[in-house]
């Protein structure tokens, strides 16, 4: 079984302009300096390159890799500038888009800064029956704040699987909220809640293993390890070896598709991962899909 546990389908109307401009700054600077020498194929108003991916693209990726599923993570940016589409419009767009193939498992996303966030979660769960919810603390909340109590209680009561971002964030988003350690009080208070810390903790990787050692309901995914390619590819194996040797049944395969796909396809990423020596077939099968399938309740 092969499941990509970390996939995005972005809609330009939901993305904060400032974050996109921050992302594009080095590209635009290169164009301004060297554009007279090279045809770079874009103008100064080029869009964020990874939104508006045709639905056929992830379907083709699943087909080419004999993939059993993609977990599609929604992020609620409406309150921080992605306000040309309401949250409910965004969720309707996403779930409708994913309905064309039953291998998609779309998750809802609700910013806890909304005053009616718990009620919105309940409403969206009744409407769409998602398997889980995506958290993005960089929009401006600490996961362990007291004001989050009603939010987490609703998530727990509804039995939602949680995927939370960890690591770097682009302005106007703030990575100070994205430390894995901040999830410890939540994981301890709700031991039945399953929580996936994305990106192996990202730039706060050193906080991940102590958290997982303390809380056996905390998992992680390997998405965005492609960021080490091609110059420091050895880090992919190192990070995976470190995690799998400690928590073989609590790390899941993920890519952050489509963020790296133009440079390093899912197939290339898998080939790189396959350079490691697997401790057993069970550990390999758990990593690629069985653990995520159990978390989704489909195995």
Task: Locate each region found by the language model.
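Hydrophobic faces of well-ordered beta-strands that scaffold small-molecule active sites
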Residues: 3-7, 70-72, 105-108, 131-135, ...
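Divalent metal-dependent hydrolysis catalytic cores, especially in the metallo-beta-lactamase
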Residues: 29-51, 56-82, 103-109, 131-132
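Alpha-helical scaffolding within the catalytic cores
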Residues: 53-61, 89-94, 118-119, 180-183, ...
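Mid-to-C-terminal alpha-helical segments outside catalytic/metal-binding sites
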Residues: 1-5, 12-61, 122, 247-252, ...
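H/E-rich (His + Asp/Glu) clusters that bind or coordinate divalent metals
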Residues: 194, 202-299
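Active-site environment of divalent metal-dependent phosphoester hydrolases
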Residues: 10-13, 77-80, 112-116, 168-172, ...
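Active-site gating/metal-coordination segments in enzymes
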Residues: 68-178, 227
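Acidic-histidine catalytic/liganding microenvironments
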Residues: 100-101, 127, 190, 215, ...
């Amino acid at each position: 079984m092969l499941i990509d546990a970390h996939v995005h389908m972005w809609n330009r109307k939901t993305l904060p302009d400032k974050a996109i401009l921050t992302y594009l700054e080095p590209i635009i600077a290169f164009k301004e300096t060297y554009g007279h020498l090279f045809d770079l194929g874009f103008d100064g108003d080029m869009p964020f390159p990874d939104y508006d991916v045709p639905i056929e693209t992830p379907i083709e990726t699943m087909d080419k890799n004999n993939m059993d599923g993609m977990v599609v993570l929604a992020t609620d940016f409406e309150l921080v500038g992605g306000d040309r589409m309401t949250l409910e419009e965004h969720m309707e767009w996403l779930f409708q888009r994913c309905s064309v193939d039953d291998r998609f498992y779309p998750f809802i996303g609700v910013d806890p800064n909304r005053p009616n966030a718990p009620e919105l979660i309940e409403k969206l769960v009744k409407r769409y029956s998602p398997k889980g919810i995506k958290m993005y603390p960089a929009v401006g909340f600490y996961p362990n704040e007291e004001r989050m109590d009603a939010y987490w209680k609703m998530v727990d009561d509804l039995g939602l699987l949680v995927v939370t971002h960890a690591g770097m964030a682009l302005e106007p988003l703030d990575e100070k909220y994205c430390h894995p350690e901040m999830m410890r009080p939540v994981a301890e208070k709700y031991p039945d809640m399953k929580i996936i810390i994305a990106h192996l903790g990202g730039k706060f990787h050193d906080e991940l293993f102590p958290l997982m050692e303390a809380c056996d309901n905390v998992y992680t995914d390997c998405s965005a390890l492609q960021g080490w390619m091609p110059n420091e590819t050895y880090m992919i194996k190192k990070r995976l070896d470190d995690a799998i040797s400690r928590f073989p049944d609590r790390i899941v395969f993920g890519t952050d598709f489509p963020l790296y796909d133009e440079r390093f396809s899912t197939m290339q990423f898998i080939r790189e991962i396959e350079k490691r020596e697997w401790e057993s077939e069970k550990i390999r099968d758990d990593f690629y899909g069985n653990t995520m399938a159990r978390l989704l309740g489909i195995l």
